[in-house]
């Protein structure tokens, strides 16, 4: 009913997009009004407009004031330089991007050309514009292709690629317009916040970005954070042992859905085998038998003991590696290395490693060299990163299905832009078969039929494995074809461009080659245009629509159809068991297609279920990262001040005062009788940090109040600090020492904090049992941890500065070496464990409070 009302409402009043386009049309007419004037200008005069616009900005005009004329200038430049003039719909898209919104434009509508309009306009401010694409190939192609327009108009254009060194990156970021991938952009931001000298930073601020394929960047990839990792000192033997054990363990049957009624009735679920795999949530759990097997293998009494946490963690990792991570689907093995395959694009991601030991577990499984485990040095989610921009716009062919998420998380609305020519592609109903074997045979038959009449075919697969299987089947039939998957993405663009030629057959993994147009030749058009065959429904309707959208660009003919079997993951994991049971009992002859409207709705429901599930995962990730983000902002702000060369003396004197006040408050107060002041305890906690002479009853005989005691100790501490400074011939040398030490302490403590917060997040799930919201609990504890970190930074910084010796030249250095970056899509991230010394309840608390661990931060552990 709600949908009928919505449909009726939009018929009567028009959709949100139609309203917005109506409001933009007067601006479009203004731009078109400049057409003749622009044509009359010489190249030199057209180029001169850039300087004129900059002058007008400096005199108080705004970008909005300049927009109509500036867009007309870019339009004319496009015609002169590339022979491409922006259509009306592209001008609309350009205005929407400048407004910081998302333009939904169908494939082949020239999104790349659209971005030149807002990029030019916003670059006039001189603060830099980032054009974000999904891969290096597109960044390079677009910077060379569209960059010609900007360079013709006198702007500088740069591109940042994965293999570039620091000087090249700095140069590219200093250009007016920079083309770059989302991953490089995020990792450069994190690396900039790890440098020890300001001159080593590469970015110059986050002003305006235009995100191409915005759904892929802000939705698909937002489920996992960007992580920069360094090496931990943990042995790799345990991974190999756990892999041996995992291969001896027996997988139990999947547990049926556990309903609320079962829980109320207290019905226990029967487990068998040593472990159970939940493919839906990508989780592995041990059964009672499995726990016993692990205990006997490692000769331990109780796997649940805290000291056996590492064994438990590694056994689960080995089981995940062997049961949930599939070769040639999630990763490939090449030259003795495990390379991650991006599950959205099907591309190999060199240099990426799964975090939390999963990569090592896969290395052990595949019998290649197990590399040292990594620990997290810096991380951020795409949500929090892109929200740091002053303004952001995005383009994609498919965004409306996720409009709610764009609004809620990024504050961006989606405006659907009409196509330049109507879409005439024929989208056929899904062809459903009982088994995968029958389905693949039907796909090959469909390819043969189309190929016989010269119709080009693009077969979209979800995994490398399936693309290779179909390739073998087509070869057996003698059909010449190209395969496009993660293994060959160097040839990607060339193969995609050829995919529209008469008689061409192309198999592509997922959305490999997205961003490159498939152009039809005349014979292909006559044969019915590009035929798209999807070999499986994707988790997301949006990605299915992207595959369909490869055909029928700019009013071309074409058709699309998905082939599905009841054995596909989507149907197996999320389809209704009852429905599948019905079709199995119908006794459909082998190889025959099943058609039923119940099936279509089951497929759509399954996809909606997964989409809302994935939205929940992203929202949950963001809620946790928001807490981390507050800490991250404070730490990065502090680092920036140090790097900028500000004097830190006032801040350090403030730290000294804070510590003295804190230590005195632990042992004395104005309300207490002076005889009750615990001076022994004060010496014990204060002197290791500030090396004053011991405080005795005689030395404080004149003092009556604890506030006076604080003042006296502060006076002495400052005098001692000034004396330390005088040991250095040049005060500026000591200022640099302060910066070096503060930087080193901040970095080390922040690294520990990231890993501690990670562990906290893993353990916090258990709090839900106590009827408390895990995120609220996480917030409360993390604020305490942050206070403890700040106290610890103050203690360590002061302690080191009072004890520094002049003969040793102190240099800034990174506290840990970066060994890699990571994009882990296999599961929710686990804790990144540090092999630090174990703290026992009666040990002094490492926060420096002087209390026993059990009475201080141990309370929260």
Predicted regions: what is each one?
Residues 459, 507, 750, 786, ...:
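Hydrophobic, well-ordered secondary-structure elements that form the walls
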Residues 837-854, 858:
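Short Cys/His-rich zinc-binding micro-motifs
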Residues 35, 432, 624, 739, ...:
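Generic anion/oxyanion-binding catalytic loop in active/binding sites
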């Amino acid at each position: 009913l709600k949908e009928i009302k919505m449909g009726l409402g939009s018929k009567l009043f028009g959709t949100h997009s139609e309203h917005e386009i109506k409001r933009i049309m007067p601006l479009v007419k203004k731009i078109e009004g400049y057409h003749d004037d622009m044509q009359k200008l010489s190249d030199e005069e057209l180029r001169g407009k850039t300087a004129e616009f900059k002058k007008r900005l400096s005199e108080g005009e705004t970008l909005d004031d300049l927009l109509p004329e500036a867009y007309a200038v870019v339009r004319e430049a496009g015609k002169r330089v590339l022979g491409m003039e922006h259509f009306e719909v592209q001008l609309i898209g350009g205005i929407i991007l400048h407004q910081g919104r998302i333009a939904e434009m169908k494939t082949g509508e020239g999104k790349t050309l659209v971005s030149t309009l807002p990029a030019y306009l916003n670059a006039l401010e001189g603060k830099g514009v980032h054009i974000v694409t999904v891969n290096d190939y597109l960044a390079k192609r677009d910077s060379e292709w569209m960059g010609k327009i900007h360079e013709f108009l006198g702007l500088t254009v740069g591109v940042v690629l994965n293999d570039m060194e620091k000087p090249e990156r700095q140069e590219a970021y200093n250009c007016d317009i920079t083309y770059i991938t989302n991953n490089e952009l995020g990792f450069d931001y994190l690396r900039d916040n790890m440098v020890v000298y300001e001159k080593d930073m590469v970015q110059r601020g986050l002003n305006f970005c235009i995100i191409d394929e915005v759904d892929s960047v802000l939705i698909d990839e937002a489920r996992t954070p960007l992580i920069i990792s360094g090496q931990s000192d943990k042995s790799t033997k345990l991974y190999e042992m756990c892999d041996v054990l995992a291969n001896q363990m027996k997988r139990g049957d999947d547990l049926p859905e556990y309903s609320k009624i079962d829980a109320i009735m207290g019905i226990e679920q029967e487990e068998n085998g040593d472990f159970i795999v939940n493919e839906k949530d990508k989780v592995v759990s041990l059964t009672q038998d499995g726990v016993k097997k692990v205990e006997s293998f490692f000769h331990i009494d109780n796997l649940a003991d805290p000291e056996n946490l590492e064994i438990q963690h590694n056994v689960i990792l080995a089981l995940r590696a062997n049961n949930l991570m599939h070769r040639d689907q999630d990763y490939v093995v090449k030259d003795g290395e495990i390379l991650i395959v991006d599950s959205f694009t099907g591309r190999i991601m060199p240099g990426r490693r799964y975090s939390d030991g999963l990569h090592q577990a896969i290395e052990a499984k595949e019998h290649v060299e197990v590399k040292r485990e990594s620990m997290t040095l810096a991380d951020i989610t795409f949500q929090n990163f892109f929200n740091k921009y002053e303004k952001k716009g995005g383009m994609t062919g498919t965004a409306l299905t996720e409009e709610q998420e764009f609004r809620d998380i990024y504050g961006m609305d989606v405006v659907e832009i009409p196509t330049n020519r109507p879409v005439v592609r024929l989208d056929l109903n899904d062809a459903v078969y009982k088994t995968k074997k029958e389905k693949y045979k039907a796909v090959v038959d469909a390819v043969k039929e189309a190929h016989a009449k010269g119709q080009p075919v693009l077969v979209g697969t979800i995994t490398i494995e399936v693309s290779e299987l179909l390739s073998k089947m087509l070869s057996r039939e003698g059909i010449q074809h190209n395969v496009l998957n993660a293994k060959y993405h160097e040839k990607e663009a060339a193969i995609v461009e050829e995919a529209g030629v008469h008689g061409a057959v192309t198999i592509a993994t997922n959305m490999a080659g997205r961003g490159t147009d498939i152009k039809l030749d005349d014979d292909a058009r006559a044969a019915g245009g590009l035929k798209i065959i999807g070999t499986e429904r994707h988790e997301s309707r949006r990605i299915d629509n992207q595959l369909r959208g490869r055909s029928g660009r700019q009013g071309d003919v074409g058709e699309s159809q998905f082939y599905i079997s009841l054995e596909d993951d989507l149907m197996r994991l999320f389809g209704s068991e009852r429905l599948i049971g019905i079709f199995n009992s119908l006794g459909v002859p082998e190889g025959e297609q099943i058609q039923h409207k119940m099936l279509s709705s089951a497929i759509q429901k399954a996809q909606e279920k997964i989409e809302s599930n994935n939205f929940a995962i992203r929202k949950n990730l963001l809620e946790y990262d928001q807490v981390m983000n507050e800490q991250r902002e404070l730490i990065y702000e502090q680092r920036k001040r140090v790097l900028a060369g500000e004097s830190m003396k006032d801040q350090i004197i403030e730290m000294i005062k804070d510590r003295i006040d804190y230590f005195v408050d632990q042992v004395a107060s104005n309300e207490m009788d002076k005889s009750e002041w615990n001076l022994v305890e004060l010496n014990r906690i204060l002197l290791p940090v500030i090396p004053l002479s011991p405080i005795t009853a005689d030395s404080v005989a004149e003092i009556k109040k604890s506030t006076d005691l604080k003042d006296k100790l502060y006076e002495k501490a400052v005098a001692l600090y000034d004396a330390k400074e005088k040991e250095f011939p040049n005060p500026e040398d000591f200022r640099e020492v302060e910066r070096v030490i503060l930087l080193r302490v901040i970095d080390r403590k922040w690294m520990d904090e990231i890993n501690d917060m990670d562990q906290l997040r893993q353990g916090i799930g258990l709090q839900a049992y106590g009827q408390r919201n895990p995120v609220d609990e996480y917030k409360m504890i993390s604020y305490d941890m942050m206070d403890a970190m700040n106290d610890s930074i103050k203690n360590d910084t002061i302690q080191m500065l009072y004890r520094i010796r002049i003969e040793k030249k102190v240099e800034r250095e990174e506290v840990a070496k970066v060994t890699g970056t990571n994009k882990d899509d296999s599961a929710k991230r686990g804790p990144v464990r540090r092999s630090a010394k174990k703290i026992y309840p009666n040990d002094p608390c490492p926060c420096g409070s002087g209390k026993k661990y059990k009475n201080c931060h141990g309370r929260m552990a």
